[in-house]
């Protein structure tokens, strides 16, 4: 919002921008202030594939992602006793991913088998540096932080996390109508403490393509596709900070004396948030798939919910990440799509879509027992 009166001169007699007062900023100063961000990103990938023997293939692939961001803010002083300031920050990040899979394919008459073993490593690192200063001798040297009479702050940061995964998958198909899939994976994340780092997640699925059965062949002009499926699987989440399991220390000053203080409260018994989902469904198609859709029922159970839980203020902290409880939701889904008009020769189509779903969520368990207390605690520790 501009609050400069229109009768105020924009420039002084010597041609410089008119400095009015603390309460009235000449918009020409705002135009000369600089606030910009610059960024560069690079992604590179290299892969190798080796057919060891017929049906057995080894694949390895490495990916590197690099990003750099720089933010600059230069503010000129806009009144006689004002203070100019500058802030510069820079951040670099790297993500390394190395994936390896060994795949085996085998077909024997009516039997089809696909097996896969895999190993993956993903590592993320970021480095940051920022500095700010104020009270420059001249606005033309705002880009040189060394010329600031007051060095406001200098800060650096480093973040990293690593995820190591092993996994296996087995797919079996018989006569293109009976299908089975089984998977297992183990994930180890540096976001958890040494004793809770690994999570284990199995899953399985069965399917029966009923429309391929002989007793429906005479009705294929009506029932073009019919598939019954069921599955159960467990997945994990590591949606938390890189160092949530560790109590971190930060810098502080007291009476101009340097010191350190706890900056965040860690929890070394944090573990993977897990979700078990069960589902049964039917996929259908009628009259050459002119009418098609699916209907399904599912249940999901989430255990060891990760949540930033409030703690008493007397602890000097506001919250700590914890596994606080479990959720359960269940429901059904139904959808249908109808091709009312389907004339490919004249490029004329008219579709009708309809879907309905119902979901019920229940909080089954809550471990949080935090109580709020007034007041606070000093967080300065003199060394």
Could you describe each region identified by the protein language model?
Residues 11-14:
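Charged, amphipathic alpha-helical segments characteristic of ABC-type P-loop ATPases involved
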Residues 1, 16-75, 84-383:
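Extracellular/periplasmic, surface-exposed regions of secreted and cell-surface proteins
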């Amino acid at each position: 919002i501009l609050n400069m009166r229109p009768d105020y001169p924009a420039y002084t007699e010597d041609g410089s921008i008119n400095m009015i007062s603390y309460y009235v900023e000449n918009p020409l100063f705002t135009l000369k202030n600089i606030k910009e961000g610059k960024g560069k990103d690079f992604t590179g990938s290299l892969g190798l594939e080796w057919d060891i023997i017929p049906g057995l293939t080894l694949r390895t692939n490495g990916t590197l992602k690099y990003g750099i961001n720089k933010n600059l803010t230069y503010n000129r002083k806009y009144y006689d006793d004002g203070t100019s300031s500058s802030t510069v920050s820079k951040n670099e990040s790297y993500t390394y991913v190395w994936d390896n899979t060994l795949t085996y394919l085998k077909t024997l008459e009516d039997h089809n088998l696909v097996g896969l073993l895999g190993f993956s490593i993903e590592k993320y690192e970021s480095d940051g540096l920022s500095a700010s200063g104020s009270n420059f001798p001249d606005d033309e040297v705002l880009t040189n932080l060394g010329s600031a009479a007051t060095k406001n702050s200098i800060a650096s940061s480093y973040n990293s996390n690593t995820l190591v995964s092993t996994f296996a998958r087995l797919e079996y198909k018989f006569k293109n109508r009976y299908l089975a899939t089984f998977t297992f994976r183990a994930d180890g994340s540096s976001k958890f403490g040494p004793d809770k780092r690994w999570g284990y997640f199995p899953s399985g699925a069965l399917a029966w393509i009923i429309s391929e059965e002989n007793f429906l062949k005479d009705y294929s002009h009506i029932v073009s596709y019919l598939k019954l499926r069921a599955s159960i699987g467990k997945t994990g989440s590591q949606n938390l900070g890189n160092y949530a399991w560790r109590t971190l220390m930060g810098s502080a000053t007291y009476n101009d004396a340097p010191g350190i203080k706890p900056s965040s409260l860690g929890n070394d018994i944090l573990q993977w948030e897990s979700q078990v989902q069960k589902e049964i469904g039917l996929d259908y198609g009628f009259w050459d798939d002119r009418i098609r859709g699916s209907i399904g029922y599912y249940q999901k159970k989430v255990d060891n919910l990760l949540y930033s839980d409030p703690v008493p203020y007397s602890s000097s902290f506001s919250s700590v990440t914890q596994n606080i409880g479990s959720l359960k939701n269940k429901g059904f889904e139904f959808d249908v799509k109808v091709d009312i008009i389907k004339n490919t020769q004249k490029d004329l189509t008219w579709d009708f879509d309809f879907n309905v779903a119902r979901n019920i969520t229940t909080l089954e368990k809550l471990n949080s027992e935090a109580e709020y207390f007034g007041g606070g605690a000093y967080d300065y520790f003199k060394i």
